[in-house]
Amino acid sequence: METNGKALSGYRFLTLLERPELKAAAASWFHEKWGVPDEAYLACMTAYLSGETEYGWYLCLDGERIVGGLGVIENDFHDRKDLAPNVCAVYTEEDCRCLGIAGRLLDLAVEDLRAKGVSPLYLVTDHVGFYERYGWEFFCPAQGDGEPEPTRLYIHR
């Protein structure tokens, strides 16, 4: 796949299980993007790497640089605790956007968890139109913890 002059095949897509030595760097990277404490990411990643949970962490590397990533957790800070697990912390570096990286990461997470018998997946977002391109459907509104307005909750079946 070639987009914006750079081949997507030039990037490496992987689970954190494939490169567990990236745990600290990945936690720091997600913290920089979302402001959630490193410790929260480290706890979730450690649970994944130790086999406590099948909910994974997925990265895109350009060489050794993390340029995209996302995680899967029980609940992404909203009131619909019955809708789990949730994709969280989806992010692609600005200089790598519009190449299909986030879509590939989303597909990787869906395929990985489906192979483990985990389906459907959910996510909360204010973006309209982006996730639909990758098979996600609007499911219902959800109230984010501490948020004044409801947000959109999507499902991938």
Language model features: what each stretch is:
Residues 1-24, 157:
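Conserved N-terminal entry element of GNAT/NAT acetyltransferase domains
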Residues 20, 27-40:
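Helix-loop element at the rim of GNAT/NAT acetyltransferase active sites that forms part
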Residues 34-61, 67:
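Active-site rim helix/loop that mediates acceptor-substrate recognition in acyltransferases
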Residues 55, 148-154:
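Short hydrophobic/aromatic beta-strand or adjacent loop that forms the aromatic wall/cage
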Residues 59, 65-75, 86, 91:
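Conserved beta-strand in the GNAT
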Residues 92, 98-111:
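Conserved acetyl-CoA-binding loop-helix of GNAT-fold acetyltransferases
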Residues 115-119, 125-150:
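Conserved active-site alpha-helix within GNAT-family acetyltransferase domains
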